[in-house]
Regions:
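Acidic (Asp/Glu)-rich catalytic clusters
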Residues: 25-29, 49-60, 80-91, 173-174, ...
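Internal, glycine-rich beta/alpha segment that forms the wall or movable "lid"
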Residues: 3, 77-81, 85-210, 221, ...
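An alpha-helical appendage that flanks or caps ligand/catalytic pockets
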Residues: 112-148, 194-301
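Hydrophobic faces of well-ordered beta-strands that scaffold small-molecule active sites
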Residues: 5-11, 35-37, 60-64, 91-95, ...
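N-terminal beta1-alpha1-beta2 module of alpha/beta enzyme domains
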Residues: 1-62, 69, 157
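Active-site mouth loops of central-metabolism enzymes
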Residues: 5-18, 65-74, 153-164, 217-221, ...
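Short, acidic/polar
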Residues: 14-27, 79, 162-174, 291-302
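Haloarchaeal acidic low-complexity proteome signature biased toward cell-envelope/secretome components but also
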Residues: 1-5, 14-19, 26-27, 202, ...
Length: 335
């Protein structure tokens, strides 16, 4: 199998940023190709990623979806280029439209025109890396521009987009270098890849020019019931409580009644009912959860989808260190 295997970790799982670097070393030893870390309302993503880059030799380093509202486009460009140099060319920058909750309740910005903003941020970032200036005239940003003191970069990091919907995914194909979707069934992913390819066509690119790395969250354990219970709770919570986008996406993939029931339970803040509303059929479509053999087979099948270049494996919530190690070992020999 020629696909890469990425490891997605959450900053909230660690007591200190150095823990991310320790996980990166573990991932490299097990044969993972890349580690990626998300940023929401906890630590700033840059120090943990820098530590991870410094402690590893060949492991790819990525941030997961970063908000286009929380930093200026020029600062995002500086961050990406700095990380690329810190990682000796192993960095990939991840961005996406974000969500109303993060944008308005954390960054204090209006969640306005997210796709247009994301596009303009990418174009400004490319201006800094390729032309040495953020100068730009757009519908959202007008920047007179100063000179980036380090000049154009010889090897700027690729830009990956985390998107779900058809128009957003078309944008990813057109303006990005990679795509990192989440919570897609196999059939749903195949269908959305058509939107990605359409966007690539608009930019005179092939689908093969993009790194397609779908995110899956799961758990492997000899106690199959425990693994499925924890995965069910996490996936249900994502569908009901993480804003509208994941739920809308899964509903459009054929499960509107399931999403509606989960959301109704969330309205009552009944997390047990949320989990109970996620049937085995849907859990099996969305998450690798079960024995190590079952999880390994699930991820291998997902990796075999035509057009997939990597599978980005993350943990469901509430795992012990032993649980995480078992899950990593279950999938480490797939790539």
């Amino acid at each position: 199998m020629t696909v890469d295997l990425d490891l997605l970790v959450q900053l909230g799982d660690y007591d200190r940023p150095q823990g991310v670097a320790e996980r990166a070393v573990q991932a490299e030893e097990l044969g993972f190709d890349r580690i990626t870390v998300g940023e929401t309302t906890g630590w700033n993503i840059v120090p943990p990623l820098t530590l991870a880059a410094d402690r590893t030799e060949e492991l790819g380093i990525s941030n997961d979806v970063i908000s286009p509202y929380g930093r200026t486009p020029a600062m995002l460009a500086q961050t990406a280029l700095t990380m690329q140099d810190a990682a000796d060319g192993r960095f990939r920058f991840g961005i996406g439209p974000s969500s109303p909750a993060i944008t308005e309740r954390w960054h204090g910005k209006e969640f306005d025109r997210p796709l247009r903003r994301t596009r303009e941020v990418i174009e400004i970032m490319r201006g800094v890396s390729e032309e040495g200036t953020p100068a730009y005239e757009g519908e959202i940003f007008e920047i007179p521009g100063l000179k980036y003191e380090r000049g154009p970069h010889e090897n700027p990091p690729p830009i990956d987009l985390g998107t779900l919907g058809p128009k957003a995914t078309e944008m990813a194909g057109r303006f990005g270098d990679g795509w990192t979707p989440q919570l897609f069934t196999k059939d749903g992913l195949r269908e959305r890849l058509e939107d990605l390819e359409r966007g690539a066509d608009l930019a005179d690119k092939d689908l093969s020019d993009l790194r397609v790395a779908p995110i899956v969250r799961g758990m492997a354990a000899e106690d199959r019931g425990k693994a499925r219970e924890k995965a069910r709770s996490t996936i249900a919570f994502m569908l009901g409580a993480y804003g509208p986008y994941y739920g809308n996406s899964v509903a459009e993939q054929g499960y509107p009644d399931v999403v509606e029931e989960i959301r109704a339970a969330w309205d009552e803040r009944d997390t047990d009912a949320m989990a109970a509303a996620l049937p085995d059929e849907v859990l099996d479509e969305l998450a690798p959860a079960g024995t190590p053999e079952e999880v390994r087979e699930w991820v291998a099948d997902y990796a075999a989808i035509d057009g997939v270049d990597a599978v980005r494996v993350g943990f469901v919530d509430g795992l012990s260190e032993e649980d995480k190690r078992t899950t990593m070992e279950a999938v480490a020999d797939i790539a």
